[in-house]
Amino acid sequence: MSDRVSVTIGIPFRNARRSLATAVRSVFAQTHHDWELLLIDDGSTDGSIEAVRRLEDPRVRLVGDGSHRGLCARLNQIAAMARGTYLARMDADDVMHPERVERQLALLQTDPSVDLVDTAIYTMDDDLTPLGVRGDRPLDCRPESVLRDGLLIHPTVMGRAEWFRRHPYDPVFVRAEDRELWIRTCTTTRFARLDRPLFFYREGPGGNLENYLRTERTLRDILRRYGPPLVGTRRTRLLVMRSRLKSIAYRLGTRLGQQARLISRRNRRLEAAEVREARSILAAIQGTPVPGLDNDAPAPSVERRLPGEAAA
């Protein structure tokens, strides 16, 4: 395999056996074929590695050291190991639209001033049923908006691999590492968005209260660090108070059994035609043959780099 490809698709995973194969299948369904798939295990114990060890394609690298180091460390590892000029993010429980890489790559190549581009998303449940659309409005890159609302939809982000190497994720900000990265770089980075949903984001019906509260606590730490120089002390205090009120509202909503409703408010409801289109795309992805996962698919060699195994 050549040492250089146009795009590295990086998927960090931990205990994702139930969803990982579908995520991988969506990579093989891409209309752009000059990619490498970098699968980084973060100490799985559920057989996730065994589920993808069967992959037989020279564009795939499966890497694991047996340890649990956390998402930030694995994302930085992906950037360090990427052979591609461009790097596309993805999580192990999500699914890419077949045109995702092609369309993001076209934008980045057409306009070299753009550093990072994300896309709108379909949200879906655990059964891959489309639920709604999010992120189909233009980006607001003003510092206060970035502090208040975030910016990019993290698993859909694609950019030059060198950008990610220059701007690593900070492991101090667990569960909000993406928000910290966008805020840290918002005055020196140009962001863009494709407002067509090119990604399927898996979203549980109720979420997790403790995770949500932990995220908001981390966001308040980020606001205190970056807010004053960007928007001033007074505006920062208001943003911190807003975060506290959101935590109170979410805690109350959980007690009242309204978690699903709170989550659904983030989405735009799908029209009937959009539901049909989304289902058709997902069906096509699920029917995409993958060497090694499907007995009748072509089976070239795969590079594996796991403890005790030499690279192919």
Task: Give the ranges of each region predicted by the language model.
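Short loop->beta transition adjacent to catalytic acidic/histidine clusters or analogous donor-positioning motifs
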Residues: 4-8, 28-39, 47, 58-61
